[in-house]
């Protein structure tokens, strides 16, 4: 007879640990424990059966025992204890009213660095890119906050600097893909290292900082995200051969928002020294360019390399391709890949050789970013402390004037006056849309989300169809083929039967009998019905061969598909009713 096992020595009870027990084991306060878990990426877990853990079903927070044991070896534990000692000494000196001692203690404040945690949580650079969405959302949010008692000015300035550096990379790499204006903010989506990165940037309005938000927790996330984005920006700049941190004086023409008023004054005073430094940096970059390209992975080369190296890589791929393999497998050839790359490159240069001028009322911080990301040139008037753009409003090269007002006092010939939505719709359509529907004072078409992909059974608004047709320069009526213009189909069975009858009569069967045109539609309908019946019979036979589990799953899929179709029909009918009501109101007027 084996030894009787005691309760709590094996199974679920040994895999989970309550939060209070974990705090006692680590000898930390609850605030420090929460901060450590956020920095290390450890989150609470829900046991499958709470009663087996502690014998109670009360609401408690549990963690994996292995995660808590992992925290025992974290160097930040000692740093937190030093901070606790520092706070106690500082409080004691302030109570004794010793300003000299307080100043000396503040100079020796322990610094918490999370550099090692970034490498620990993201072993590869692609892992960091995948987890960049929340990081960018947090930093763009804090970059719009004003200075308060909780939010320090130095923290806000650092967020703005890192966000501007990231936007400058997106502009240089032509990585922006989609933009959407919502009531929450502006959604951006970029493709970096083959990974899709989506973030939201708030509108630059007066921000009212809420009081019911725990900024201590958000500050802990912000501390980690600041370090993460700093490392990511450094690596991204290295892939393009750019100097980091960027020389904002030289990049003013591409990202003027990244340079503050103080930097602009310093740039005017030290123009010669900056030019010499930039020349030295460029020379060093040219010398190390070949070595850096060899160290980069193939994915980085495909994104950052010039077009001539892309052409060489495609030619190499074509030479290495095996015709036998290509014939047996549906493998894209080098020419197909080259065409796809050329199409993608053209989509990122839709504003190439176009000159834009922004009026004062439009959101320059967003329009400048998206226009430059797609190869356009942009300028603006001087406003408050901001300096004017590279060219004036009367420049003859200007092709598009972005205005968000009913009318303008002065107009220039040879340029289009459009509203800001035209820029964003062109980006999402990947083509230059007609400007007739975006003129001054015009009722704008709906700004549809580019993140919604309609399926075969989903409802597609007429505006979406018109937008897709305009992007492809194809009229909506050309997408459907009239049945009367379709090529006539001849049933093989009818031809064989008539040939056999002609042979029995002794007629010449060299030529097939000409089909009467009146029976074409009927014959096509009969053939379609036969094909549909055969398809239904095949499906029923396949369902009989399914197991009960697969048949249930299949029925659920079919039911869901029918529900989508019914919902799409309801939306279509509702839209038709709304259009009829609108047309009736217009006719009455």
Curated annotation (Swiss-Prot):
Its main location: nucleus. InterPro entries: BRCT_dom, BRCT_dom_sf, PES. GO terms for cellular component: nucleoplasm; PeBoW complex; preribosome, large subunit precursor. Keywords: Coiled coil, Nucleus, Ribosome biogenesis, rRNA processing. One of its GO terms (biological process) is maturation of LSU-rRNA from tricistronic rRNA transcript (SSU-rRNA, 5.8S rRNA, LSU-rRNA). Residues 346-440 form the BRCT domain. Residues 287-297 have a biased composition (Acidic residues). The keyword Transmembrane helix does not apply. Residues 528-553, 576-589 have a biased composition (Basic and acidic residues). Residues 261-305, 520-587 form a coiled coil. It comes from the Eukaryota. The keyword Coiled coil applies. CDD domains: BRCT_pescadillo_like. Belongs to the pescadillo family. This is Pescadillo homolog. It comes from Monosiga brevicollis (Choanoflagellate). The lineage of its organism: Eukaryota, Choanoflagellata, Craspedida, Salpingoecidae, Monosiga.
């Amino acid at each position: 007879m084996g030894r009787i096992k005691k309760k709590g020595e094996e199974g679920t009870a040994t895999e989970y640990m309550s939060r209070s027990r974990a705090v006692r084991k680590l000898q930390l306060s609850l605030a420090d424990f929460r901060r450590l878990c956020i920095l290390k990426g450890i989150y609470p877990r829900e046991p499958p059966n709470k009663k087996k853990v502690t014998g109670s079903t009360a609401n408690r927070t549990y963690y994996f025992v292995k995660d808590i044991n992992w925290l025992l070896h974290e160097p930040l534990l000692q740093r937190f204890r030093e901070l606790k000692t520092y706070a106690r000494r500082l409080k004691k000196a302030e109570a004794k009213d010793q300003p000299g001692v307080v100043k000396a203690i503040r100079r020796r404040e322990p610094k918490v660095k999370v550099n090692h945690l970034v490498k620990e949580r993201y072993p590869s650079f692609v892992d960091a890119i995948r987890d960049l969405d929340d990081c960018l959302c947090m930093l763009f949010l804090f970059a719009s906050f004003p200075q308060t008692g909780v939010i320090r000015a130095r923290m806000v300035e650092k967020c703005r600097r890192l966000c501007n550096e990231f936007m400058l990379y997106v502009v240089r790499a032509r990585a922006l893909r989609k933009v959407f204006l919502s009531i929450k903010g502006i959604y951006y989506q970029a493709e970096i290292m083959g990974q899709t990165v989506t973030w939201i940037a708030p509108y630059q309005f007066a921000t009212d900082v809420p009081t019911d938000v725990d900024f201590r927790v958000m500050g802990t996330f912000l501390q980690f995200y600041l370090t993460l984005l700093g490392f990511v920006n450094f690596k991204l700049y290295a892939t393009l051969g750019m100097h980091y941190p960027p020389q904002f004086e030289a990049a003013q023409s591409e990202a003027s928002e990244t340079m503050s008023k103080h930097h602009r004054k310093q740039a005017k005073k030290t123009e010669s020294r900056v030019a010499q430094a930039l020349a030295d940096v460029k020379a060093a970059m040219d010398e190390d360019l070949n070595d850096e390209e060899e160290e980069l992975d193939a994915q980085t080369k495909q994104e950052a390399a010039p077009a001539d190296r892309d052409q060489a890589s495609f030619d190499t791929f074509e030479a290495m391709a095996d015709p036998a393999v290509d014939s047996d497998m549906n493998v894209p050839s080098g020419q197909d890949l080259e065409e796809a790359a050329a199409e993608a490159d053209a989509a990122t240069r839709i504003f190439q050789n176009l000159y834009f001028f922004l009026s004062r009322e439009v959101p320059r911080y967003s329009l400048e970013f998206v226009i430059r990301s797609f190869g356009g040139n942009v300028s603006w008037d001087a406003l408050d402390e901001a300096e004017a753009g590279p060219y004036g409003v009367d420049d003859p090269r200007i092709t598009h004037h972005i205005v968000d007002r009913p009318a303008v006092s002065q107009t220039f010939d040879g340029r289009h006056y459009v509203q800001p939505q035209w820029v964003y719709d062109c980006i999402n359509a990947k083509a230059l849309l007609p400007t007739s529907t975006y003129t001054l004072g015009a009722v704008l078409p709906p700004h549809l989300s580019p993140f919604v992909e309609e399926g075969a059974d989903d409802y597609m608004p007429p505006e979406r169809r018109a937008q897709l047709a305009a992007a492809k320069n194809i009229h909506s009526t050309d997408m459907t083929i009239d049945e009367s213009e379709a090529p006539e189909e001849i049933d093989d069975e009818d031809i064989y039967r008539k040939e056999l009858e002609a042979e029995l009569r002794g007629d010449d069967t060299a030529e097939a009998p000409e089909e009467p045109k009146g029976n074409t539609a009927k014959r096509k309908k009969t053939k379609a019905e036969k094909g549909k019946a055969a398809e239904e019979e095949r499906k029923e036979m396949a369902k009989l061969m399914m197991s009960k589990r697969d048949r249930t799953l299949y029925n659920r899929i079919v039911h869901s598909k029918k529900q989508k179709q019914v919902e799409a029909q309801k939306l279509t009918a509702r839209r038709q009713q709304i259009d009829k009501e609108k047309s009736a109101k217009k006719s009455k007027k």
